[in-house]
C-alpha cells in the first residue's frame, strides 16, 4: 500500500517585519566585513511601530553608520510611506551596539591563525532530489511565490500590493516523492481601496500561475486561500514587531529536516550557527549530487573555543548507494569543518550576507553562494568508488 502524506512549508516576503530585521542586521554585517574582514559581529535588530533598535556586540576598527544603513534597507524593501506601516525617512533608529566580550574573543582567535568555534551548538544541512537545486519542493515553491510577490509589486505589474506578505505551500507525497500541489496560501498586504476580489485575481494570475508553470508537478486540484481573512491593509512593523532570527525554518529547509536552533543573520562567519550550517548544506548537496545517496541530512556540533567539531552525523534516510560509515569517513576526509576551514573553503569573509537574508539561504543557485556549488563531486566519487 502506498504511503501518502501532505507536507507544508512557508516563506515570507522581504517586507515581513522579521525579514526586515534580518536584512538590516546583515546589511550592517556586510558594511563592516567589507571594510574589516576580521571583524567580529553579532548584530540584532528590533522593529516596531515607527522605530528600529539595533543591538549586539562588535569587535572592529571600522565605523558603520547604523542609522543610514538601516534606513537604506527599509527604503529598498519599499517602506516609503507611513501608510504602508513604516517610513524609512521618519522612523526612529536607536543604536545600542556594544563591544564583544574579551572572554569570547580569547576562545575564538587562537594562535597560529586557528579559529575556535564562537559558541557551542549543533547545525544541520540537507539536500534531496525533489528539485534541480536539490531542495525540498514545498519550501522551493513557497520562496518562489514570495519572490514573485515582491517582483510584481516593485515592477508595477500589481501596483496595489504592499511589502508585507507570506506564502505557504502544501505538497502531496506518495512513497516519499512529491506528486501534486495540494494547497497554496498567500497573504499579502495591499492598498486600502482595493477589493478582495481584485487582490485574489491578481495574485492568482500574476504570481501563483506563472510560478507553478515552471514546475513539473500535478497542479490540477489545488485549494487556494488568498488573503483568507479578507483584508490586509495594516502590515509591516505597524502590524507586528519584527526581530532578527525569528524565521529560522523559512531560512533553511521549511521543516524538512531538523534545526539546531541558531539563527544566521547579523553573525560573522566565526559564528558556527551560520558558517557550519552553510558548510553542512555544502556537504549534503555534494553527497547527493555525487550519487552517494538520494537524500542527506548532516549534523555537525561544536564546543566553544574548540576548532574541530565534537561530532559529525550523516543520515541518508535509507537512500544510500554505499555503506553509510564510508560516507561519514568521506565527509571527515574531504571536508575541513573547522571554522577556519569553512571560512577559507567557502570564501565567507566577503559582503555577501544581505542577499541571503530574504527568500532562503539555500537552493539559490542564481545568487552565486559558494555553499551551493557542487565542486566536490569528483572527489567524493573517487573516495567512495562510485
Swiss-Prot record:
Enzyme type, top EC level: transferase
Reaction catalysed by this enzyme: L-methionine + ATP + H2O = S-adenosyl-L-methionine + phosphate + diphosphate
Region Flexible loop, annotated ranges: 100-110
Record GO biological process: one-carbon metabolic process; S-adenosylmethionine biosynthetic process
EC number: 2.5.1.6
Top-level taxonomic group: Bacteria
Keyword Transferase: yes
Pathway(s) served: Amino-acid biosynthesis; S-adenosyl-L-methionine biosynthesis; S-adenosyl-L-methionine from L-methionine: step 1/1
Binding annotation for Mg(2+): 18
Positions in coiled-coil regions: none
Database matches in PROSITE patterns: ADOMET_SYNTHASE_1 (PS00376), ADOMET_SYNTHASE_2 (PS00377)
Ligand binding (ATP): 16, 164-166, 231-232, 240, 246-247, 263, 267
Pfam families reported in the protein's UniProt record: S-AdoMet_synt_C, S-AdoMet_synt_M, S-AdoMet_synt_N
Residues at which K(+) binds: 44
Assigned keywords, A-Z: ATP-binding, Cytoplasm, Magnesium, Metal-binding, Nucleotide-binding, One-carbon metabolism, Potassium, Transferase
Subcellular localization(s) per the UniProt record: Cytoplasm
Subunit: Homotetramer; dimer of dimers.
Biological role: Catalyzes the formation of S-adenosylmethionine (AdoMet) from methionine and ATP. The overall synthetic reaction is composed of two sequential steps, AdoMet formation and the subsequent tripolyphosphate hydrolysis which occurs prior to release of AdoMet from the enzyme.
Record family assignment: Belongs to the AdoMet synthase family.
Protein name per the record: S-adenosylmethionine synthase
Amino acid at each position: 500500500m502506498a504511503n501518502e502524506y501532505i507536507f507544508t512549508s512557508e516563506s515570507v516576503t522581504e517586507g515581513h517585519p522579521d525579514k526586515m530585521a534580518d536584512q538590516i542586521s546583515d546589511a550592517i554585517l556586510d558594511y563592516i566585513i567589507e571594510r574589516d574582514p576580521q571583524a567580529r559581529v553579532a548584530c540584532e535588530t528590533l522593529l516596531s511601530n515607527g522605530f528600529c533598535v539595533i543591538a549586539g556586540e562588535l569587535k572592529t576598527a571600522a565605523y558603520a553608520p547604523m542609522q543610514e544603513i538601516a534606513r537604506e534597507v527599509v527604503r529598498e524593501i519599499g517602506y516609503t510611506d507611513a501608510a504602508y506601516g513604516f517610513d524609512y525617512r521618519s522612523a526612529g533608529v536607536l543604536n545600542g551596539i556594544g563591544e564583544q566580550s574579551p572572554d569570547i574573543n580569547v576562545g575564538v582567535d587562537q594562535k597560529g591563525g586557528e579559529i575556535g568555534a564562537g559558541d557551542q551548538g549543533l547545525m544541520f544541512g540537507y539536500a534531496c532530489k525533489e528539485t534541480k537545486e536539490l531542495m525540498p519542493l514545498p519550501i522551493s515553491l513557497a520562496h518562489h511565490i514570495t519572490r514573485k510577490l515582491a517582483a510584481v509589486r516593485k515592477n508595477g505589474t500589481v501596483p496595489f500590493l504592499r511589502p508585507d506578505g507570506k506564502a505557504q505551500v502544501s505538497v502531496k507525497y506518495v512513497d516519499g516523492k512529491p506528486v501534486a500541489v495540494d494547497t497554496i496560501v498567500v497573504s499579502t498586504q495591499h492598498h486600502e481601496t482595493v477589493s478582495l476580489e481584485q487582490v485574489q485575481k491578481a495574485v492568482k494570475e500574476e504570481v501563483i500561475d506563472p510560478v507553478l508553470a515552471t514546475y513539473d508537478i500535478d497542479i490540477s486540484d489545488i485549494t487556494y486561500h488568498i488573503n483568507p481573512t479578507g483584508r490586509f491593509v495594516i502590515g509591516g512593523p505597524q502590524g507586528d514587531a519584527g526581530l532578527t532570527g525569528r524565521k529560522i525554518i523559512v531560512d533553511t529547509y521549511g521543516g524538512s529536516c531538523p534545526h539546531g536552533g541558531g539563527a544566521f543573520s547579523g553573525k560573522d562567519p566565526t559564528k558556527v550557527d551560520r558558517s557550519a550550517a552553510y558548510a553542512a548544506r555544502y556537504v549534503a548537496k555534494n553527497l547527493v549530487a555525487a550519487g552517494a545517496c538520494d537524500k542527506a541530512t548532516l549534523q555537525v556540533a561544536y564546543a566553544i573555543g574548540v576548532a574541530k567539531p565534537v561530532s559529525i552525523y550523516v543520515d541518508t534516510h535509507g537512500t544510500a548507494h554505499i555503506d553509510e560509515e564510508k560516507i561519514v569517513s568521506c565527509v571527515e576526509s574531504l571536508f575541513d569543518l573547522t571554522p577556519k576551514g569553512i571560512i577559507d573553503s567557502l570564501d565567507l569573509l566577503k559582503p555577501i550576507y544581505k542577499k541571503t537574508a530574504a527568500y532562503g539561504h539555500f537552493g539559490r543557485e542564481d545568487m552565486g553562494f559558494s555553499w551551493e556549488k557542487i565542486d566536490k563531486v569528483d572527489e567524493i566519487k573517487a573516495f567512495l568508488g562510485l
